[in-house]
Amino acid sequence: MKTSHRLKLVGLLSWCIAMIALSTPAQAQTEYDIWICGTQVTSENCGDLSVIEGVNGTVTYDPTTKTLTLQRATINIGEEGQAIYSEINDLILKVIDTNNVTTVKASALFITKPLTITGGGTLNAKSQDFCAIYAWGTDLTIDDCTVNASSAGYGITGDSGESEKLTIRNAAVTTEGEQEGAICNFHSLTLEGCTLTQPAGAAFDASLNGVALNGELVKRGLTIAKGTSGILQPTISTTAPKGIYTLNGQKLRGSLPAQAKACISSAERKS
């Protein structure tokens, strides 16, 4: 009897534990609106996205700062789908060192909400058939980094060109879209701390919604160089009249005071 009671007690306790376990909801993982090689980023995998097939190197996502970090990373999805697809508002794509993002029949980087590419490194985005970087009805900023975008279709592109804004700030960019355009389908292009250097004479054409030359969109060899502001440097005349002049241009008689000479000498040393 004692054994029977003991077994019943153990059975009852086991049943109670099982019921408690069943009634306690499992901790659900959080899903984020960003996909890498077709796999959605979650609270479980965001700390190491190299677990996704097609991803190598260091790839992480910080949901607190909405930052996707690539460091010496290769993301290659192969035939179908986008290498990186994002619906996150104000996503930051931080590139450290050199990173390669490639696909075949879709966009290497596809965004539906504003994105800033930054981090001081290099992003090589390549699509064999479609878009290297596709800003679908949204704004794209490239800031303090290097971006090389190439595709047989579109290089860096918006969608309709009605509202999409492309801002390139203190960055170096090369892009080509062999069939459609290197930079196209944008409402505006803003360059800060950099200059469109190739092809010579190319500029943003609002009527074509892209960078154009001679009335046609540039498709190959478009280069934006960092650190050239386009401000002309003043030319100093070597035949300026000798003497001492006021700010109004009147010539003074006598020699320059010693204090003034000392100030000029100091200024020359600083320059």
What are these regions (language model features)?
Residues M1, S23-P25, T246:
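A composition/secondary-structure signal for short, hydrophobic, low-basic-content segments
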Residues Q27-G227:
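A composition-driven surface/loop motif
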Residues I17-Q27:
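C-terminal segment of classical bacterial N-terminal signal peptides
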Residues H5, A26, R169, A225, ...:
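Serine/threonine-rich, low-complexity intrinsically disordered segments
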Residues R6, I17, T98, Q259, ...:
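Generic N-terminal leader/processing signal
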Residues L232-S271:
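C-terminal outer-membrane/trafficking sorting elements
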Residues K2-S14:
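Bacterial N-terminal signal peptides that target proteins for export
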